[in-house]
């Protein structure tokens, strides 16, 4: 099973790429993390947020792996603890499908895309830069895996 992070945005600062890469390389081969960047839609005064999200939705859907479990990151999503994520990983592995975590653009995700998701997940109640969410998610996936393996990285 692969873990995909499909994120609107490109040209992230070097520290974002370094942070993401650090946690991605720690993952075992059977849970490899792959980042798929989606070009953000250009915003102008005449464009509505809905039209921007609709255009980004098409790009996101084109980047989603076929038959993947879609987990949309959304501020109104469910609050999960790291332990809940750690409990979900083995179940998802047994299911056999890849998991795609979707990070929207500045306006969020289109309602139709959120409806398609099997899970809406909130990463934080804080407002975070979208690039930082990539790093945070990669770290939490690594931490969740480390919990399932009794690895010393997680000492809770």
Curated annotation (Swiss-Prot):
Binding site for S-adenosyl-L-methionine: 73, 104, 123-128
Catalytic activity, EC: 2.1.1.177
Top-level taxonomic group: Bacteria
EC supergroup of this enzyme: transferase
GO cellular component: cytoplasm
Residues of the signal peptide: none
Keywords (A to Z) from UniProt: Cytoplasm, Methyltransferase, rRNA processing, S-adenosyl-L-methionine, Transferase
Subunit structure: Homodimer.
Role, per record: Specifically methylates the pseudouridine at position 1915 (m3Psi1915) in 23S rRNA.
Family: Belongs to the RNA methyltransferase RlmH family.
Protein name from the UniProt record: Ribosomal RNA large subunit methyltransferase H
Species for this entry: Burkholderia mallei (strain ATCC 23344)
